[in-house]
Amino acid sequence: MILYHGSNVIVEQPKLIRQNRYLDFGFGFYTTTNRDQAVNFAQKVTDRRKIGAATVNIYSVEEAVAFKECSLLRFDSPDEAWLDFVADNRQGTYQGKQHDLIYGAVANDDVYRTITLYMTGVLDKEQTLAALKIRKLFNQLVFATEKSLQYLHFEGRELV
């Protein structure tokens, strides 16, 4: 499987760095199979930080091996379990089992607005899930432990 990570720097050896904000799937190194999504993120992060150059880092992972050797939490669609997991992580309240790898839909800006309406009580769970079904969602694979990072191999980078 080929994976991409958008950044403002080259990331040959990914590290787990604590963020100062809460993300969809919690703490970890975020990747995607969607190159366009990585390009978009690289441009956003470079604009926000005003340093570096928009860079798409390219990785490979033998998913059959990694998914067997690591604990994997997989969301195949943005369902109720995914919504609860993302909402808990975004609020910093997730207390469940920790996993090595987490795969599922990305809560991008549009999706995040919908989730925020849910977290603030404007939308209920049913309304939120219905709204998410009409959105085009991309994926993310998060490497959440040092163990999981062992399966991620840097293949190169592309300035975008």
Regions found by a protein language model. Give the residues of each.
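Glycine-rich loop/turn
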Residues: 1-29, 37, 43-47, 81-83
